[in-house]
Amino acid sequence: MEGDTISRMMGSGVQMDGKILQTFEKSFVQVQNILDHNRLLINEINQNHESKIPDNLGRNVGLIRELNNNVRRVAHLYVDLSNNFSKSMEASSEGDSSEGRGNRRIRPA
């Protein structure tokens, strides 16, 4: 199902091989899992804060560190996704050019 979503996002004019789509899907699943975990962390942080119990407030320090590390991981995953997408588009356009679809017209000076 998620692969279908990625295919729809790519549009009908772009062809990508299954391995590339699997890589994108894997990255998106990783991001979603981290974001889901972050939601749980934020809820726990809020509950601890509202309780004002010293032990719970102390626990928030570690939870906030974990949250920050997770945000950093998501940012890195998105950078990797962006780089992989750019590389796949470059490879796709190079393939189009080598197949004769990239014919250029020479304009007079």
UniProtKB/Swiss-Prot annotation:
GO terms of biological process kind: positive regulation of circadian rhythm; rhythmic process
Q: Native species of this protein?
A: Arabidopsis thaliana (Mouse-ear cress)
Q: Which gene encodes it?
A: EFL3
According to its UniProt entry, what is the function of this protein?
Component of the central CCA1/LHY-TOC1 feedback loop in the circadian clock that promotes clock accuracy and is required for sustained rhythms in the absence of daily light/dark cycles.
Q: Which InterPro entries match?
A: EARLY_FLOWERING_4 (IPR040462), EARLY_FLOWERING_4_dom (IPR009741)
Keywords, ordered alphabetically: Biological rhythms, Nucleus
What is the taxonomic lineage of the source species? Eukaryota, Viridiplantae, Streptophyta, Embryophyta, Tracheophyta
Cellular component annotations (GO), alphabetically ordered: nucleus
From the Swiss-Prot or TrEMBL record, state where the protein is found. Answer: Nucleus
GO MF annotation list: protein homodimerization activity
Please name the PANTHER family in this protein's record: PROTEIN ELF4-LIKE 3, PROTEIN ELF4-LIKE 4
What are the start and end residues of every segment in region (Disordered)? 88-109
**Hey, which family's this protein in?**
Belongs to the EARLY FLOWERING 4 family.
Q: Which coarse location class applies to the principal site listed for this UniProt protein?
A: nucleus
What does the record note on quaternary structure? Homodimer.
Protein name per its UniProtKB record: Protein ELF4-LIKE 3
